[in-house]
Amino acid sequence: MLGDKQKAFRQSYRSRIAGWYNGMLHVAVIYIIGITALWIYIQHIDNVLWWEWLTLPIVGIACNLFEWYLHRQVMHRPLKWKGFRAIYDRHTLNHHQFFTDQEMRFRDQADWRVTFFPPYALVIFILISLPGVAVLNFLITSNVAWLFICTTTSTYLIYEFMHFCCHVDENWFVRYFPF
């Protein structure tokens, strides 16, 4: 059951969503950017050696640790730097007031606005990965570098999907999906 504070916040938040906002388009843009980026990366991978494949689990674990750290140290703490403060505001002051333990579900696709990151966040995440790509390309191999950015980008897309699943009604897929 929704409390009065959460009802009021949801009503206020929803009233500020632009009339042209389309949740399906929002998600489509994110995944078009991500899948296009992955397609470009994969075009550069050639004759991967067995040990280069180790990049995937190593970077996958590192990405999850990074997400945990970011969530704990930035998304739940009002830091002074403007960029971090914006992340905190969006996550803690919007997302965690919109959704609570009592009500985690979307009403409709307009509610996706408070759940999915803006599409430019994926672009920023890709840009943050580029120095790692350059270093790995220089120090190890180009395959390791491309597998690195494939993993960071894929982790972002998987995170968005899994987070979405946290806010939909319980169903067979959500219950049995192996993540």
Predicted regions mapped to residue ranges:
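Cytosol-/stroma-facing membrane-proximal "stalk/adaptor" domains immediately downstream
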Residues: 152-179
